[in-house]
Design a protein with these regions (language model features):
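Membrane-embedded and juxtamembrane structural elements of multi-pass membrane proteins
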Residues: 1-193
Length: 193
């Protein structure tokens, strides 16, 4: 990965900076973005030196912003570390179908829905269609390159993206995005007290 070309386009770097500041609110994190051939879906990995890998897909600026936000939120939630732990547990319990097959796919869906929920607060409601389009572009790219590349990002993405029920659930949730006003949050908090 250290030999891979880094993103050099000013436009992409500006989109990345805007997405980064919306997620982390500070410049203390060092996250590299690498666009490369050979992967089918965007992916974020690494706990101490996180990296975002982007496939060779032409996204619009807003779609790219949504993709980068999505991956940065995965990094913020430390989803990659959770997946590694889940993979380890699956290896230990390889004989148990619930743990080795069902639990990882459920965890993947929960992580994706949690990221979608987190994005609701950042992405303007009018851009939810761009977010959904970026998911569809990624799915089309992953399915068209399915036979050529079966890397780990493809495996996780195809398990999650090819499941129509999961996609329907995500798109339904994205369609229902509504920005919550701070006053509503305050009222809810006051009601709890």
């Amino acid at each position: 990965i250290s030999q891979m070309p880094r993103l050099s386009s000013n436009n992409i770097n500006q989109v990345y900076q805007r997405a980064f500041l919306n997620v982390f609110k500070s410049k203390n994190h060092n996250i590299e973005v690498i666009k490369m051939e050979g992967i089918s879906t965007p992916a974020a990995f690494g706990l101490f030196h996180p990296v975002i890998l982007l496939p060779n897909i032409e996204f619009t600026e807003t779609e790219l912003y949504c993709v980068l936000l999505h991956e940065l939120i995965h990094i913020k939630h430390r989803d990659w570390g959770i997946k590694v732990i889940m993979d380890f547990i699956s290896c230990i319990h390889w004989w148990n179908v619930c743990v080795s097959i069902l639990l990882p796919s459920m965890l993947q869906q929960i992580q994706e829905l949690y990221v979608d929920h987190s994005m609701e607060a950042i992405v303007p409601t009018q851009n939810r269609l761009d977010y959904a389009n970026s998911i569809l572009k990624t799915l089309r790219h992953a399915q068209s390159n399915r036979k050529q590349m079966m890397d780990q990002t493809s495996y996780y993405a195809l398990c999650n993206l090819s499941n129509k029920k999961n996609l329907r659930q995500r798109f339904y949730y994205i369609e229902k995005w509504k920005h919550k006003k701070k006053s509503n949050t305050f009222i809810a908090f006051a009601a709890i007290l």
